[in-house]
């Protein structure tokens, strides 16, 4: 009924180019690499789900929008009290940091959002079982987001 073809546990370097029914993206769009991954996922999937507050709203990484990318990177990699000889990463593999962190839907069309940090298992289960039943929920019911 369900076949997982690509995940961080298997291999993200060579996902299928087509035939993917549901794609699941987590994490905010923080750099140029994230943009490319989101675009590839959108091209290859019939349905794209943004999972977690970071993918849905930008989450904690979007807090850097308040101070700017340069200030945030300098604080994180150079000025922290535990850092000795810090260097801000500069790698093509990591991608160039964006000036503004956003949720996935600011880059590509997202069909379903499952917010939460982390998302509740009930919410994720509801979304996946609805999709397996051939329904794409527009809004997840409030009871799957109730926190005690």
What is the predicted role of each segment?
Residues 1-148:
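Iron-sulfur-associated redox domains of electron-transfer enzymes in respiratory
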């Amino acid at each position: 009924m369900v076949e997982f073809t690509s995940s961080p546990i298997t291999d993200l370097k060579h996902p299928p180019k087509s035939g993917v029914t549901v794609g699941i993206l987590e994490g905010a769009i923080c750099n140029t690499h994230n943009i490319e991954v989101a675009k590839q996922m959108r091209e290859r999937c019939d349905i794209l789900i943004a999972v977690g507050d970071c993918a849905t709203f930008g989450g904690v990484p979007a807090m850097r929008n308040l101070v700017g990318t340069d200030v945030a990177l300098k604080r994180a990699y150079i000025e922290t009290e535990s850092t000795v000889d810090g260097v801000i990463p500069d790698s093509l593999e990591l991608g160039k940091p964006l000036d503004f962190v956003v949720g996935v839907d600011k880059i590509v069309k997202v069909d379903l959002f499952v917010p939460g940090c982390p998302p509740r298992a009930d919410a994720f289960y509801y979304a996946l079982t609805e999709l397996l039943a051939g329904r794409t929920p527009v809004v997840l019911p409030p009871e799957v987001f109730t926190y005690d």
